[in-house]
Structure formats: C-alpha cells, structure tokens
Amino acid sequence: FFHAEDGIRDQPRSRGLGDVYKRQVTHDSYEAFYLGSKCGIILNQELKQFDDPYKVYHFPNSVEVVNFLNRGILIPAKVTGENTLENWDLGTIEGNFMKPYPKGSNVQLLLQPEDLEHDDKSNLKLEVVDRKFRGTNFIYTLKTNSNLLIPVFVHSHHIHQHEVDEKFGIKRPINIDHIVCF
C-alpha cells in the first residue's frame, strides 16, 4: 500500500477519503516504492509500518514486514561486539546496528541482496544455485554450507557471469551499513 501526497492533495475535495485510497493502493511493493511518497504495510487488517519507502525497505520494523516484502532473508547470527556479529557460514559481519543488542545475543540478521559484494579473489566461496537477469543487474541465489539460500546483486556489466553449480566469492570483511536484527 502506498500513499502519494501530491495525488491526495490534488484530488477534488468532494471525493471521500475511501475514493482516494481506492486509487492509491497497490499490493506490489516495487510499485509502491517507486510511486509512493509514503508506504504503509497492512497485514491482517493492522497497520504494521508507515514511513517513506526507503525506510520501509531498509529498516523494516518486524519480521512480518520482512516476510511480506520478500526482499531478503533472515539468517542466524550472534552479537560479538558493539558493531559486529558472527554467522556460522559468513563469518564476521561489521556495521551499524539499528537497535542495540547485548554482546552474546542470538539474533536473526536481515540480509538483503545488496548487502553482500562479489569478489572472485575472496576465500569465502558459496555455491550458485540460481541466476536471474534483471536488466541493470543479476540476482544470484547462493547456497551456504548450512544450506541457507542468500540473494546477492551483481551489476550486469560485471566482467564474467557465474553459472549454476560454480563457486561465487563474497568480499570480506562483510560490512553492512545498517544492520537490522530481530
């Protein structure tokens, strides 16, 4: 669901709010992110999050919103410091936590396709299980040793493409600008 402020402001005053929302509602999050100045996620008749599209995407406030958006995965991790956590398959992940967690906390880390960077020279290699062309980029689905499936974007101008069953390097250290955990 999205809200375009200009669209609402420009509607004739004689129309009711329900009429405006009929024209301004979508179930496609890509469309909502593109068109909306504000996005609201309504699940089970309850408003779960309402904010600008950037914040809804990058800072979802619940696992329900993460699952609804379906733009990343939650992986198990352990908080090891003020700006670090560990995942069994990926190793150390650095960044800025959006909420504080005590050292030693077990959390679910949100990994979005743009969070990991490809690096052919890296010693962290994951198996390619799928590759989809998306115009400006490819989205690779990579399998970890513990069978997690992780989506990763790679610019479509990348020198070479990786095929299914090939190994795919992930740049280390892993640094995520904003670490979202639950």
Model regions: which residues?
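Non-catalytic connector elements of ABC transporters
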Residues: 72, 82-182
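Internal alpha/beta loop-helix hairpins
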Residues: 22-91
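A generic local structural motif
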Residues: 5-9, 27, 94-96, 156
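Single conserved hydrophobic/aromatic residue that forms the stacking wall/gate
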Residues: 1-21
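Short, solvent-exposed secondary-structure boundary motifs
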Residues: 1-3, 64-70, 119, 131
